[in-house]
Design a protein with these regions (language model features):
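Forkhead-associated
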Residues: 1-67
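Regulatory inter-domain linker segments that are low-complexity and enriched
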Residues: 65-79
Length: 79
């Protein structure tokens, strides 16, 4: 899932500090990672600048002038 200020981003945020496609979150069904997409201003996770890093529930992602909290919400699949 890509995040940025461009309409082509999966999640579009009106923040001039964000690149058109700033970062993406990758989820494999068990584990998640955040990857900076060569943004101009960089992406930080829990206060550390990253290129790519594994993330867990309640991880703070900062990009541009925006803060994001990654949440994992379990859901029950009924049969």
């Amino acid at each position: 899932t890509s995040v940025g200020r461009d309409a082509s981003a999966d999640i579009q945020i009106d923040d001039n500090g964000l690149s058109r496609k700033h970062f993406e979150i990758v989820w494999d069904g068990k584990n998640a990672a955040v990857r900076d997409l060569r943004s101009t201003n960089g992406t930080t996770v829990n206060g550390k600048k990253i290129d790519e890093v594994a993330i867990a529930d309640n991880t703070l992602i900062q990009a541009g002038r925006s803060d994001f909290t990654f949440r994992v919400i379990a859901r029950t699949i009924s049969e």
